């Protein structure tokens, strides 16, 4: 409590963002804390108790980041429609829309789909969803940070001016990659626990994902589900390979595995949402699902190559066997029609007619 001997509060920090929130150091020098002040009821259980709520507290941080990314797009999109350059609005320039706007709209749609799914599961299930919370936080906060950066770029010099707000969004959203566990902590959690479940289930965990996406691809061939089915099968092989080659203590490689399964699981949520969509939203979500799944497949191809050939720890023959078994070459070829799909999304965003 304030006034406790040995406890002092420093002056407020000058921060990169969230400046309206006071942040100051707290110093405890030989502070005696009464037993009655114990939080949680049982000594030594603090981390375990915290882990029980991280599934939704990290999801809350991800939702904050999603709002920031969407807010940045809501500034950049009308600006692109109004700003005339080289004889027409910026919204007609594919180098502008397809680099600075559309990829982030795809990611925000994927983020929304994943967070909705996990939030509904938290409301209806009692089991721990810590890994899902970590996946949501890792993907959404990093995607929103990139989104805000490109939306600032999309406004040119105006993006650097406080009046247009994007620079503030860019400063504020960065904290979501840091507090409630940094992105690197999330990668460690995701890789470790997904590796454990891949081993414990003996392939059933990712096998079920592959089967679901294969069934969706058979029902609807236009949602990128076939790419995700291949990725799910490759994910199990990648974890098996990491175990066999004793790569699980190589932190960077575990981060690579975390990024792979994150892309897979977020992509599945977007494909499911696209399958359930109706009316005008359906075409845009289907296009976004195809773009996202193609990007995920290409990320898998790069990740598999990193595992197989990126270190001195793996024999060349073993690495080649992984790439062949996991279908890395086929995953790398994903992306047919991506530009046309981005056209569809841009048309909807900017109200363009074909």
Could you describe each region identified by the protein language model?
Residues 1-66, 70, 85, 162, ...:
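FAD-binding core of flavoproteins
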Residues 18, 124-214, 280, 284-354:
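Alpha-helix capping/hinge segments and adjacent helical runs
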Residues 39-60, 73-106, 116-133, 159-163, ...:
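Glycine-rich cofactor-pocket loops
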Residues 78, 113-116, 145-153, 240, ...:
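Charged/polar positions within long, soluble alpha-helices
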């Amino acid at each position: 409590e304030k006034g406790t001997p040995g406890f002092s509060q420093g002056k407020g920090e000058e921060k990169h963002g969230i400046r309206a929130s006071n942040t100051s150091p707290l110093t405890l020098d030989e502070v005696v804390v009464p037993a009655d002040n114990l939080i949680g009821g049982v000594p030594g259980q603090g981390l375990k108790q915290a882990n029980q709520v991280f599934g939704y507290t990290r999801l809350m941080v991800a939702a904050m980041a999603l709002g920031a990314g969407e807010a940045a797009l809501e500034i950049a999109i009308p600006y692109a429609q109004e700003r005339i350059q080289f004889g027409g609005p910026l919204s007609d320039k594919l180098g502008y829309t397809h680099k600075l706007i559309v990829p982030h709209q795809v990611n925000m749609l994927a983020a929304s789909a994943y967070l909705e799914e996990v939030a509904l599961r938290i409301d209806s299930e009692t089991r721990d969803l810590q890994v899902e919370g970590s996946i949501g936080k890792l993907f959404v906060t990093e995607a929103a940070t990139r989104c805000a950066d490109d939306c600032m770029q999309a406004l040119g010099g105006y993006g650097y001016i406080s009046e247009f707000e994007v620079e503030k969004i860019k400063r504020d959203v960065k904290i979501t990659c840091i507090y409630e566990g940094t992105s690197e902590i999330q990668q460690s959690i995701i890789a470790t626990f997904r590796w454990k479940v891949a081993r414990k289930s003996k392939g059933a965990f990712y096998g079920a994902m592959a089967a679901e996406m294969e069934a969706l691809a058979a029902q609807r061939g236009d949602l990128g589900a076939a790419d995700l089915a291949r990725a799910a099968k490759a994910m199990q092989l990648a974890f098996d390979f990491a175990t066999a080659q004793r790569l699980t203590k190589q932190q960077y490689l575990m981060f690579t595995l975390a990024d792979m399964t994150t892309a897979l699981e977020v992509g599945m949520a977007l494909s499911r949402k696209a399958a359930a969509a109706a009316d005008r939203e359906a075409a845009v979500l289907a296009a976004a699902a195809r773009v996202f799944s193609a990007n995920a497949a290409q990320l898998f191809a790069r990740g598999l190559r990193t595992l197989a050939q990126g270190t001195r720890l793996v024999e060349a023959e073993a690495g080649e066997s992984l790439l062949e078994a996991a279908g890395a070459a086929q995953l790398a070829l994903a992306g047919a029609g991506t530009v046309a799909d981005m056209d569809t999304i841009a048309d909807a965003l900017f109200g363009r007619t074909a």
